[in-house]
Each structure stands twice: as C-alpha cells, then as structure tokens.
Amino acid sequence: MSMILSASVIRVRDGLPLSASTDYEQSTGMQECRKYFKMLSRKLAQFPDRCTLKTGRYNINFISSLGVSYMMLCSENYPNVLAFSFLDELQKEFITTYNMMKTNTAVRPYCFIEFDNFIQRTKQRYNNPRSLSTKINLSDMQMEIKLRPPYQIPMCELGSANGVTSAFSVDCKGAGKISSAHQRLEPATLSGIVAFILSLLCGALNLIRGFHAIESLLQSDGEDLNYIIAFFLGTAACLYQCYLLVYYTSWRNVKSFLTFGLICLCNMYLYELRNLWQLFFHVTVGAFVTLQIWLRQAQGKAPDHDV
C-alpha cells in the first residue's frame, strides 16, 4: 500500500531537528530508514533544494527553503507529485507559523514539536487521496517536477553515520563527480555580485568588439582573423568565470586561475587595439573575479544531531 510513513522538519545549517511526526513503525526497514534520515540531516547543505533518496522499499524526499528542510518517508510506489505537494504544504504552514528568528535561534531539538499536530493531519489527508482538497494545485506541482525533477541522491553520497556504512560506498567514485556539481557554495557577498556584473560587462564588450572585427573582415579592411578569435575567447573566459563564481565544480580554483591566464593572454594579443586603460580594466576585473571565486568556497560539513 502506498502511503506517507513519517515526516520531519530540520534546520539545514546544522541538522538540528525542529519537529517530527511521532507515530512510526518499529520494523527493521523503518529503523534503517531513520538511520538514513540522520545521515541526510548532516549533509543537507550539500544537496539541492529538492531531492529523493531511494532505499529499496521506501523513498525519502525532502525540500529546503530559508534554512529549513522538510523531509518525509514514504513507500516506494507513492506518487512523486503527492510527496512533494505534501512537503510544500508543510513548508508553507511552518513558514506561516514560525518566523526565521525563532528557527535560527533554536538550540533545543524538537523545540517546535507541537507542529506535529499539523504534520499528522496533513499526512492523514495525503494517505487518503479522495479527501484531498489540493487536486487543483497538483497539475502545477506535476509540471514543476517535470521541468525541474528532484535530484536522485546515490547511496554512496551518504557515507557513514554512527557506525552504519552504506552498502554502496565502494561504488562511489562515479557518483562523487555528480555530487560535486550539486554542492552548495557559501552565500554570495556584495563584492561577489559586483564581480559577477563586471565580468558580464567585460564579456559583453569583448563580444561587441568581436562582431565589429567580423564586420571589418567581411568588408576587406584587412582585419586580422586572430583578433576575432581573441575577442571571442575573451568573451568565453569572462562567461566561464561567471559560471565558476556561481556553481561548484571539481578543481574550481585551478580552473579560475587558468581562465584568468587566458584573459591575460587575450588582452596581450589585443594590445594594439586597446589603450592602456582598457587593458588595465579587463585584467583587473579578471583578477578581481578570480579572487572572489577563491573566497567563495563550498559550505562546510554540518555537525551531528539525532533525528
């Protein structure tokens, strides 16, 4: 029978459980899934805002927003659209009931345990689809999941917790490359936003000059083809710096330094077409963006809390 079995509300930055449903089975499979809950709660900051972990007979789904994650355990054949609609209802009610100040300053586990009453009522409704009053909104949720499906977490990304190691850890090499692409960076600073805008500006300037160079070449004005290549390489380098500033990738810092080197080489080649102030601007912006990429690192690992 497809149904929701339990749900939890957890603070993302440190995995502190804020509330949870209290009626759960004591079967071996359920106890194993609760161990997966613990492992996930420690690493929520490293995952995207909508994820699914398949554990065999059960699925763990969660969404994260405003520093709080909403997790649920359901049977493997429970519809995805209902699962994430259920989590969306929990999120809306929790945000309405508790302000961010309370959730950010909470120090005691399960300090919002009274929220369990709403979890239980909502769980009962979603376990009986005939009683659902949200059928109108399910089409919107279904379209959202289709356009932006939840990230499927490989077992090996969980690592180990309290002596329990995932049976799939030995096959983690390939999945590790996937997880790095979804790892979250620290929040953007004002200087980081300025660097992003300046890099886009430099890329746009290079692109415009590149098209003008193509126009001159077509008019047979003797424009060097290598100048066109240099302008477009400079554009690509600036855009890639923007990408590195926003997203986490493996060897991110090395890539940023190599990209900055390409920017310097392009501007050296374009020395005859730009004055010193233009060259100084492009190189300085490239160096500034490289520094911001280096400063904005991946979020650290959260400490343990029992869920």
Curated annotation (Swiss-Prot):
Residues 8-119 form the Longin domain. It comes from Mus musculus. May be involved in vesicle transport between the ER and the Golgi complex. The chain crosses the membrane at residues 188-208, 227-247, 254-271, 275-295. GO terms for cellular component: endoplasmic reticulum membrane. The modification Phosphoserine is found at S6, S8. It is found in: Endoplasmic reticulum membrane. InterPro entries: Longin-like_dom_sf, Longin_dom, Sec22a/c. Belongs to the synaptobrevin family. It is a multi-pass membrane protein. Coiled coil: none annotated. GO terms for biological process: endoplasmic reticulum to Golgi vesicle-mediated transport; protein transport. Residues 2-187, 248-253, 296-307 are cytoplasmic. It comes from the Eukaryota. Keywords: Acetylation, Coiled coil, Endoplasmic reticulum, ER-Golgi transport, Membrane, Phosphoprotein, Protein transport, Transmembrane, Transmembrane helix, Transport. This is Vesicle-trafficking protein SEC22a. Residues 209-226, 272-274 are lumenal. CDD domains: Longin. The lineage of its organism: Eukaryota, Metazoa, Chordata, Craniata, Vertebrata. The modification N-acetylserine is found at S2. PANTHER family: LONGIN DOMAIN-CONTAINING PROTEIN (PTHR46258), VESICLE-TRAFFICKING PROTEIN SEC22A (PTHR46258:SF3). The gene is Sec22a.
